[in-house]
Structure formats: C-alpha cells, structure tokens
C-alpha cells in the first residue's frame, strides 16, 4: 500500500529578467493506493503527474507532506523501499551499446537478484513482454516499441512490489501497447500496488480501478471511473475531465 498525504512540491522560476517567483508543481495531494489496485494518475501535459510520480519514486523530495510504503518512509528505510520499486519514465535513456540481455543482467546485479535465478527471471520477463526474438540484439538497433519493452523489462527483473509507471505506452503501436496493458493487469492479480500515469483517458478507463484527476498541480476529482462519469453526467473520462475544468486547459 502506498499512502500519499498532503504532498506539495514548489519550484522557483523567473517572473522576469530580475525577479523570481515560487510556483506549485503539485499542491496538497493526498490519496491511498491499495495492494491489487491500479490507480490512474490522469491529466494533460504539465498537470504535475510526472513531478508527483518522481516524488513517490524518491527522485524528488516533497516540499511538504509525506509518502509511505506499507508504513515505510524514505527518511528511515530508503534502501528497503527502492529495492521494491519499479519506476518507469518515458524519458529514460538506455545503454545503446548493450544487448537487451546484457542490460537486464546488469539490472539483476543492481537489485541483488540471486545469481542462480537471474537467467530464469530474464527469460520470464522476456516471455511475458514477447521479447524473445530480440533479446540478444543491441538496444541501438531496436524499434521504439521494442525499446519501450526493454525499458519496462529492466523494471521487472527484481519482481517489485510497487509499480510507478509514467506514460508507459506513449508512442507505441496498438499491439505493443496492449501487451504492456495486459502485463499490468496480470501484476494486479499478484496483489502488486500500481500507479499508472497517462493522458490517454480511454486507456485509463479500461484498466484502472480508481483514478485521480490532476490539473495545474491540484486534484480535481478522484474515484472509480464509473463514479466520476456518474457525478459529471458524462459517458467517458475524457468528457468528465473537460466538464470538471470547464474546458480550460491553459497552462501556467
């Protein structure tokens, strides 16, 4: 279980050539993600989704608030938490000179996967993500979809407890996207805790148990997809989101 309580992140930016001002990337965000749940973090580009997930993944420190993982926090149990996290960002760069297998082997070493289990784990992940045909190819020679599968595979070799997935299917074709979504659903059955950020509302509606809608760093609505559609008198999450913001997507 992941519990986010009153989390805020402030940055400074230039107001003009001489003056700076503070702005809120995320402002007083709270929610709980239970075991065996897929929680969608929804919103347009610039809404604060990535900043929020980077704080949950321990990459950024919140200005205010707390984040706990089954009672553990980064202040006292950072190593224990990070050993159980899978963090996927669409901006992650891979080592192009390595083969997929070599990269996954390296990730096994980083996460202290039992040496006798490394090849078994790599084979399992490759099979689930349908990577067998290019497992021994260099990453530099892969397609966009294949590269994203490797990016996901590197997060999985240590069998994480908590998934923090930021735009996992962006830029992928329909088949590759579906393989990844099917995998996420399978991990839910194993009682993993999954946070899934996307701006694809239809995708979230299909796989998420609950969603948290964010705009301009603030939570504007949370609940199951059905609850949100019912409360906004709409038939899909996209229309619900626009109803909640009054159709205004202007970014600060």
Segments and roles (model prediction):
Residues 2, 24-26, 82:
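Conserved structural motif at the start of ABC-family nucleotide-binding domains
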Residues 65-75, 80-81:
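Conserved ABC transporter NBD signature motif
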Residues 97, 138-142:
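Conserved ABC ATPase signature
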Residues 105, 109, 116-134:
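Conserved ABC ATPase "signature" region
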Residues 163-167:
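Catalytic Walker B motif of ABC-type/P-loop ATPase nucleotide-binding domains
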Residues 222-223:
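ABC ATPase "signature
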